[in-house]
């Protein structure tokens, strides 16, 4: 039976998380579907607060092709369980149940990584095809060069390799969209059904109207070089290593920099940040440091990125891509990023700034000093950065999920489970 054209289908888009990119990426999908009548209709299955926020932004031209389904509190709790295995099976079960209830033609996981476990067991959704976005493949990092995984990372990659291999054999899995542009080639070379893996561009944020932003034009003291770390500040994002590195700066360098942390601080590290902040105040009195512990809107972030000289991305051996690179590239600002993994490779290949072993405060401090002494703009290729950002648009990002294949490849029909 031939597949329905996209405009006659409905895709159930499932996202149980509210932190990170969830709202922003769902907004891209909503905007794309509203503006493109040939795209599939979407039903967004998400926590109530996220549904309420997104529903207020539906353009009038959507013409009933976008609807929202609020998850029950118990479902949100199970899908976010601390046991990742339990959360994975809860997400699969929730998708299976709502696909049947909603009448949607296929299911799409905004984040597929956890689902590799239940899908590797061959679990399906009543014969309806599934697709989703894979954020953190790492099994191909050896091809990046100088990859020396620890035992835990090696075991993680062995586990991922097995799960990916088995997941791709699942006839219910129609497509996997990878935010890592290098993983599809690896999948095609190493997995029997690797052709299901396709590259998906991480979307650069469109420029916001900053007229209403409440960011002062002189937030950074004049004469200082501003370093900005923004987003939801977890330990993995590197704020503690940055504070440790700032202690090691020569006094002459500390007197020339301004460091701003902008974004909600993870409660788990709030005390550690305050302790380091107190130490810095004693040991580096000439250093300017500000921590703005709150969620900032897009216009505020646009303004802060534009005002800053360097954007910090000192992740701690983080696997996957980072929207921070796109914010910086679009604004023409160099990054100081981790050397590890995809973030490091993209920074080097597209000449977006400098990389460092960000798990070592001394090496991070050395690169901060280098950027201050050499001038931040000498470490970015503005033309390459502009090309990097322009090739990763919200439209390109949203068009892939909204036009996902409606059925698995011919010859491998989805079984009913």
Regions from the PLM with identified roles:
Residues 45-51, 230, 258-274, 290, ...:
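Glycosyltransferase donor-sugar binding loop
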Residues 23-28, 234-248, 271, 326:
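A conserved mid-protein helix/loop that constitutes part of the nucleotide-sugar donor-binding site
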């Amino acid at each position: 039976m031939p597949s329905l054209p996209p405009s006659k289908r409905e895709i159930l888009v499932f996202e149980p998380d509210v932190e990170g990119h969830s709202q922003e990426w769902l907004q891209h999908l909503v905007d794309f579907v509203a503006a493109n009548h040939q795209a599939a209709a979407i039903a967004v299955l998400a926590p109530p607060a996220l549904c309420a926020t997104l529903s207020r932004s539906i353009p009038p031209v959507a013409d009933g092709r976008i609807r929202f389904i609020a998850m029950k509190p118990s479902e949100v709790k199970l899908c976010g369980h601390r046991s990742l295995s339990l959360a994975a099976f809860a997400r699969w079960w929730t998708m299976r149940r709502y696909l049947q209830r909603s009448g949607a033609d296929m299911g799409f996981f905004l984040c597929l990584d956890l689902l590799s476990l239940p899908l590797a067991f061959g679990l399906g959704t009543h014969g309806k095809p599934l697709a989703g976005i894979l954020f953190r493949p790492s099994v191909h990092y050896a091809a990046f060069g100088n990859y020396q995984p620890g035992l835990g990372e090696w075991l993680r990659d062995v586990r991922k390799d097995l799960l990916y291999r088995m997941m791709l054999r699942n006839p219910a899995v129609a497509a996997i969209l990878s935010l890592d542009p290098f993983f599809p080639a690896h999948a095609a070379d190493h997995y029997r059904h690797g052709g299901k893996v396709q590259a998906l561009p991480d979307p650069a944020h469109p420029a916001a109207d900053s007229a209403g932003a409440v960011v002062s034009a002189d937030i950074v003291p004049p004469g200082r070089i501003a370093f900005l770390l923004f987003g939801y500040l977890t330990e993995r994002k590197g704020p503690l290593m940055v504070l440790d590195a700032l202690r090691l700066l020569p006094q002459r360098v500390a007197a020339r920099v301004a460091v701003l942390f902008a974004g909600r601080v993870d409660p788990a590290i709030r005390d550690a940040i305050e302790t380091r902040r107190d130490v810095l105040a004693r040991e580096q009195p000439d250093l300017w440091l500000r921590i703005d512990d709150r969620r900032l809107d897009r216009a505020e972030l646009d303004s802060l990125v534009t005002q800053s000289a360097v954007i910090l991305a000192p992740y701690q051996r983080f696997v996957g891509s980072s929207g921070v690179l796109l914010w910086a590239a679009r604004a023409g600002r160099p990054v100081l990023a981790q050397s590890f993994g995809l973030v490091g490779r993209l920074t080097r290949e597209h000449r977006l700034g400098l990389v460092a072993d960000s798990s070592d405060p001394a090496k991070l401090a050395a690169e901060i000093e280098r950027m201050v002494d050499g001038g931040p703009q000498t470490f970015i290729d503005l033309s390459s950065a502009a090309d990097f950002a322009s090739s990763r648009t919200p439209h390109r990002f949203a068009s892939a999920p909204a036009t996902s294949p409606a059925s698995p490849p011919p010859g491998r029909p989805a079984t009913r489970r």
